[in-house]
């Protein structure tokens, strides 16, 4: 059953913690000193803006944001309209083509329509320096996103967690498998997709689970906002 609690309700205290204030301060300081940080400040918390706590049905965990120009906008694996889908997302699309009847790979990589259906696209680190992968690891974001996962675990039931790769699987170790449905596979990156991400069937299995539990299934075809109006 959907909870009426919002992210604001459950995260207000966390956002007052010294570590979190320090994280924001460090990131703001880098931006002010002229370092390019992705995503833009206004997009850092988009995962929570597009998917309210009470609407979360599925969680897909990423690592840190894309670090190329114009890519990251606060949703894991997603890129802005007009930016070519990166290799991991191309592999996600390949798996969707293989497992979801009628799925046609889009030319874009903008996944907001997933987020608006209850798919929380959560990176474990929410910012990155331009061109430097993992440059904001250990700034405190991991503590914050651990808290987010524990709050979903506590306040929601029957959420499907898609944990791709060892990083996501370690991060998801706190999830109670009695309360939630956990699906694991290798990461969709070209380095590991052939080791079991292809053929994992996670998108079809997610919809099966949702249907069995009386929830609306996810339309996995990403739609640009203008197309959905």
From Swiss-Prot:
Matching InterPro entries: UDG_fam1, Ura-DNA_Glyclase_AS, Uracil-DNA_glycosylase-like, Uracil-DNA_glycosylase-like_sf
Protein family membership: Belongs to the uracil-DNA glycosylase (UDG) superfamily. UNG family.
CDD domains xref list: UDG-F1-like (cd10027)
Protein name: Uracil-DNA glycosylase
SUPFAM superfamilies, per the entry: Uracil-DNA glycosylase-like
Organism, as annotated: Salmonella agona (strain SL483)
Gene3D superfamilies, sorted: Uracil-DNA glycosylase-like domain
Reactions the enzyme catalyzes: Hydrolyzes single-stranded DNA or mismatched double-stranded DNA and polynucleotides, releasing free uracil
Subcellular location, record wording: Cytoplasm
Encoding gene per record: ung
Principal EC category: hydrolase
